[in-house]
């Protein structure tokens, strides 16, 4: 929105040419989302607190979590609102990738909102039935994959790349591309949701991964950097740095209220949508495998649930004291802040490894 105004004003004053730089608008997007979150946060939390009862607490969970009863949930609505406003202000609204990612965020956020609504109104900790949740996620995930496939304007946009082996490029047919896109979008949507079980645990890795994906998006959309780093050149992908920056700013603003002990929980409205956005951006910039590395905390949390379920069904025994794995460490006696910060540290390391793949050939 403001980019179009700046382009017109540039004819009168060259200073407005700054808005043509992605990095400049990315910084403004992050700051806008951050300050909007800090400004709107208290009012949003008060409004959410009017839903009496707050987030239901699992009866089989750690005993320390019962003190969280009544804490407002659906705080992810603050993230979605500030990200959307920031992107509409600073993004190039002629870019199809911007609209796709916003659409994915809103659609998955709607699923999460309904899930949270059931938990709060009906006092059902399980929320929306899994089959309906996965059905809706599948519809939106497949729709995003189909859109990306049929709007691809360069072969690189539908080619599978393996980090550190940049000479290996696997062209994807329609079905295989859409299936991969589906699994990454829906998979990371649920992975972030599983991780969101402790105060601030999910949002900080999300911020870190979003920042790193912003670097990949910027490089992928730049002819010089893409050629130098030997990564796929995806015209228009650079604009995604605006969305990544907005997520980083909104996430830090939300963390201000979500840090231990949390004043508000993100809820499924935030976790499902943010995970889907990370997966979508990774698919667009053709860095699916790098996302698996950088989002390793989300992957580990998901694998712990899968291992727990399979082990119990096959042997009747549980591998972990409780899944996802962050609850396992809680039940081992780790204080909640220790679990959170250590998972953050792991996330920092994994993101740095992911960024290092830019130079490894």
Curated annotation (Swiss-Prot):
Which pathway or pathways does this protein act in?
A: Cell wall biogenesis; peptidoglycan biosynthesis
From the UniProt record, list the reaction(s) this protein catalyses.
UDP-N-acetyl-alpha-D-muramoyl-L-alanyl-gamma-D-glutamyl-meso-2,6-diaminopimeloyl-D-alanyl-D-alanine + di-trans,octa-cis-undecaprenyl phosphate = di-trans,octa-cis-undecaprenyl diphospho-N-acetyl-alpha-D-muramoyl-L-alanyl-D-glutamyl-meso-2,6-diaminopimeloyl-D-alanyl-D-alanine + UMP
Q: Which domain of life is it from?
A: Bacteria
What's its EC? 2.7.8.13
Q: Which GO terms describe its cellular component?
A: plasma membrane
What is the main EC category here? Answer: transferase
Q: Which Pfam families does this UniProt record tie to the protein?
A: Glycos_transf_4
How is this protein situated with respect to the membrane?
Multi-pass membrane protein
Q: What is its main location?
A: membrane
So where does this one cross the membrane?
25-45, 73-93, 98-118, 139-159, 168-188, 200-220, 237-257, 264-284, 290-310, 339-359
Q: Which UniProt keywords apply?
A: Cell cycle, Cell division, Cell inner membrane, Cell membrane, Cell shape, Cell wall biogenesis/degradation, Magnesium, Membrane, Metal-binding, Peptidoglycan synthesis, Transferase, Transmembrane, Transmembrane helix
Q: Where in the cell is it found?
A: Cell inner membrane
**Signal peptide segment:** none
State the needed cofactors, names only. Mg(2+)
| GO molecular-function term, one example from the UniProt record | metal ion binding
Q: Which GO terms describe its biological process?
A: cell division; cell wall organization; peptidoglycan biosynthetic process; regulation of cell shape
The free-text function statement in the UniProt record for this protein reads:
Catalyzes the initial step of the lipid cycle reactions in the biosynthesis of the cell wall peptidoglycan: transfers peptidoglycan precursor phospho-MurNAc-pentapeptide from UDP-MurNAc-pentapeptide onto the lipid carrier undecaprenyl phosphate, yielding undecaprenyl-pyrophosphoryl-MurNAc-pentapeptide, known as lipid I.
NCBIfam families in alphabetical order? mraY
HAMAP family xref list: MraY
Against PANTHER family, the record matches this protein to:
PHOSPHO-N-ACETYLMURAMOYL-PENTAPEPTIDE-TRANSFERASE (PTHR22926), PHOSPHO-N-ACETYLMURAMOYL-PENTAPEPTIDE-TRANSFERASE HOMOLOG (PTHR22926:SF5)
Q: Which family does it belong to?
A: Belongs to the glycosyltransferase 4 family. MraY subfamily.
Record protein name field:
Phospho-N-acetylmuramoyl-pentapeptide-transferase
* Organism annotation: Xanthomonas euvesicatoria pv. vesicatoria (strain 85-10)
Provide the gene name from the record: mraY
């Amino acid at each position: 929105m403001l980019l179009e105004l700046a382009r017109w004003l540039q004819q009168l004053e060259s200073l407005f040419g700054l808005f043509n730089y992605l990095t400049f608008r990315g910084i403004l997007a992050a700051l806008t989302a951050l300050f909007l979150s800090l400004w709107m946060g208290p009012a949003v939390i008060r409004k959410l607190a009017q839903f009496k009862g707050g987030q239901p607490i699992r009866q089989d969970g750690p005993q320390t979590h019962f003190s969280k009863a009544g804490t407002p949930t659906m705080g992810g609505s603050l993230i979605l609102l500030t990200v959307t406003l920031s992107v509409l202000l600073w993004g190039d609204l002629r870019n199809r990738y911007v609209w796709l990612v916003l659409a994915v965020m809103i659609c998955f956020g709607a699923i999460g909102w309904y899930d949270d609504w059931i938990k709060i109104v009906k006092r059902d900790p399980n929320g929306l039935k899994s089959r309906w949740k996965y059905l809706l996620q599948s519809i939106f995930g497949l729709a995003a994959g189909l859109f990306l496939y049929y709007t691809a304007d360069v072969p690189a946009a539908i080619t599978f790349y393996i980090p550190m082996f940049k000479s290996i490029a696997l062209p994807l047919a329609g079905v295989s591309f859409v299936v991969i896109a589906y699994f990454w979008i829906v998979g990371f949507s649920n992975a972030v949701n599983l991780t969101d079980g402790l105060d601030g645990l999910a949002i900080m890795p999300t911020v870190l991964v979003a920042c790193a994906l912003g670097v990949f998006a910027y490089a992928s959309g730049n002819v010089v950097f893409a050629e130098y780093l030997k990564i796929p050149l995806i015209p228009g992908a650079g604009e995604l740095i605006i969305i990544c920056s907005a997520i980083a700013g909104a996430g830090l603003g939300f963390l201000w209220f979500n840090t231990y002990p949390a004043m508000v929980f993100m809820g499924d409205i935030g976790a499902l949508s943010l995970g889907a956005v990370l997966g979508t951006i990774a698919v667009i910039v053709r860095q699916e495998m790098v996302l698996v590395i950088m989002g390793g905390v989300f992957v580990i949390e998901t694998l712990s649930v899968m291992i727990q379920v399979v082990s119990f069904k096959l042997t009747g025994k549980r591998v972990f004291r409780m899944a996802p794995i962050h609850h396992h460490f809680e039940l081992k006696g780790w204080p909640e802040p220790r679990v959170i910060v250590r998972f953050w540290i792991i996330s920092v390391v994994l993101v740095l490894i992911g960024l290092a793949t830019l130079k490894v050939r």
